[in-house]
Amino acid sequence: MSEPQRPHVVIFTDGACSGNPGPGGWGAILRFGEIEKELKGGENPTTNNRMELLAAISALEALKRSAIVDLTTDSQYVRQGITSWIFNWKKNGWRTSDKKPVKNVDLWQRLDAALKPHEVRWHWIKGHAGHAENERADELAREGLAENR
């Protein structure tokens, strides 16, 4: 008997921070066919990188079943971290190549766990360059920031 086909979900994420650290917010758009869901949240105090990570984590944790995911972020920190750096961090006990503890390790570990049920393809786009979904994710992140001032 064949495995049921996994749904294909498209996700766009963004984070925002007023001051770094300062109040911050994150936003995410999840799209499955014609169904679209928007998520947002925030923290105070926080950093922009933490909000970028939390946007991706929150979107992936919102998925109710295993999916094939195309996740688009404007954060090189998130994309490089999850597609390149994380493998050595894990091998080195969550330490960088110069033996320092990985920054935001709590969120990197949470993102690593959130990925497990899914097949995720990571995409990067330039922020604030007129990409409609990225602009909307940015608006959601700013709303999340405003709610956490």
From Swiss-Prot:
Subunit and partners: Monomer.
Stretches assigned to the RNase H type-1 domain: 5-146
Species of origin: Afipia carboxidovorans (strain ATCC 49405 / DSM 1227 / KCTC 32145 / OM5) (Oligotropha carboxidovorans)
Protein's job: Endonuclease that specifically degrades the RNA of RNA-DNA hybrids.
Chief location: cytoplasm
Keyword Cytoplasm: yes
Protein's cellular compartments: Cytoplasm
GO-annotated molecular function: magnesium ion binding; nucleic acid binding; RNA-DNA hybrid ribonuclease activity
Gene3D superfamilies named in the record: Ribonuclease H-like superfamily/Ribonuclease H
Gene Ontology terms describing biological process: DNA replication, removal of RNA primer
Example of a GO cellular component annotation carried by this entry: cytoplasm
Amino-acid positions noted as binding Mg(2+) 2 in the UniProt annotation, renumbered to this chain: D14, D138
Catalyzed reactions per annotation: Endonucleolytic cleavage to 5'-phosphomonoester
Residues where Mg(2+) 1 binds: D14, E52, D74
Cofactor note: Binds 1 Mg(2+) ion per subunit. May bind a second metal ion at a regulatory site, or after substrate binding.
HAMAP family: RNase_H
EC number from the UniProt entry: 3.1.26.4
Protein name (Swiss-Prot/TrEMBL): Ribonuclease H
